[in-house]
Amino acid sequence: EIGVRLVGSEMCIRDSENELCFPFRRYAIGKVYRGERAQRGRFREFYQADIDIIGDGKLSVVNEAEIPSIIYKVFSEFGLKRFCISVNNRKILNGFYAMLGLTEKSGDIMRTVDKIEKIGPDLVRAILVDDYAIEGEKADEILAFIGIKGTNEEVLASLEKYRGRNEMFDQGLDELTTVAKYLGAFGVPQENFAVDLTIARGLDYYTGTVYETTLLDHPEIGSVCSGGRYDNLAEYYPVSYTHL
């Protein structure tokens, strides 16, 4: 039989879960494959560098700051200076959409918002209203929320105004604040990371912190190093795993 190496970091623990010490850190570079429609910038066969931290049912939020700190160190070693690691938390987004009574549509909203850099806010609004039957006023609230800008401290301070209205939102805000704090402690300069509420990542399995890295002098390339936390590896294995 012949097989191909699939995209999916969970594959690394499939056959050796009883031999690992957690949290397990893994780094790998190799050719991988995924089944999707080939298009510009999206390939079925490509090389990928993986950075993984896997916990046995629990993983500290501090580890969520460890990943972007590694991204910073790698890019710095490459001699790159003008890059930005954008950071957000899916719990903040899910909590905010719950405040608007849009829990059932949160996945559709996040997949649409995730395209805002490519298609612009006007088209994002049109899709929310026309395709997902979201009221225009609520669509405007969504755009205003994800459009909150400023320094990292200013964005986090703006989010504090929503505290107390949704438990998931509050948890996500606590986590994002902790991640921002530890990024500084891990030596990542303020100019190299940004709290950005437009970052959602299009895949539904992300549950916590999400990241996207862009080269500031080459925005046309798009994201060059992305990922996030997900807690659903129990769907694939008999043991509960938390994964970054």
Spans of features found by a protein language model:
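Short low-complexity, flexible loop/linker segments enriched in glycine and/or proline
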Residues: 99-101, 209
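Positively charged, Gly/Ser-enriched RNA/tRNA-binding surfaces
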Residues: 14-81, 91, 127-244
